[in-house]
Amino acid sequence: SSAAAASSETDSASADDGPTWDIDVRSYETHERVEHYVRTFSGDASTRIADRLSKGTRYEPMIREKFRKAGMPEDMYYLALIESGYDPHATSRALAVGMWQFMTSTAKGVGMRVDWWVDERRDPVRATEGAIVFLSALQRQFGSLYLAAAAYNGGPGRVSRGLSRLDQAEGATRDDLALELVDGSYLPRETRNYVPQLIAAALVGK
């Protein structure tokens, strides 16, 4: 009957509520800086973001599988979008190299080879493995994926100092604290923008 068909369509629609994430984007999607970057990534920068996401499809299965096997959220895939646009040969002005933008000392600290003959920062697989080692250590240190992301960008010392100065709201989660650091002047501007960019990239990327 038509009623049964309508019911079936409703059931089908409710079964597909759109994209899901394994990092907490919903709690922060109305944060002012997140909204700003969602608008930017969907508007003025949409062509550039689309190009970078297209480039990332080559590496996405590998990155997601490695994060999953390490027991970390697959959607940290979007961190490499912010870092390099999935470019294995990217080099920053600060001489961070590769898809995951490692400085030489950090790369060596997580077991990557960087010398005259081999630079594993430019190897998408080895660099992803190194990023997972580094992010896992930072997550254990700070108890939050978003604080770990901030420390990945700005360094754990800066995040620790910022947390020590922060007037922490009662009942705030560790992830909440990452966004509270964003709202203050506790971190350099690039690092303050980093977590909102990650959340916005995940929202727009899916």
Give a label for each model feature.
Residues 37-54, 86-93, 101-147, 168-186:
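Substrate-binding clefts and substrate-entry loops adjacent to catalytic sites
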Residues 72-88, 148-155, 199-200:
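Short, functionally critical alpha-helical segments immediately adjacent to catalytic or ligand/cofactor-binding
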